[in-house]
């Protein structure tokens, strides 16, 4: 889970 998601 990317930080920008």
Swiss-Prot record:
One biological process term in Gene Ontology:
defense response
Origin: domain of life: Eukaryota
Please describe the organ and tissue distribution of this protein's expression: Expressed by the skin glands.
User: What are the protein's UniProt keywords?
Assistant: Amidation, Amphibian defense peptide, Secreted
Q: Which residues carry this modification: Methionine amide?
A: 5
Q: What is its main location?
A: secreted
Where is the protein localized?
Secreted
Would the keyword Magnesium turn up in this protein's UniProt record?
no
Query: Which family, according to the similarity comment?
Result: Belongs to the frog skin active peptide (FSAP) family. Tryptophillin subfamily.
Tell me what this protein is called: Tryptophyllin-T2-4
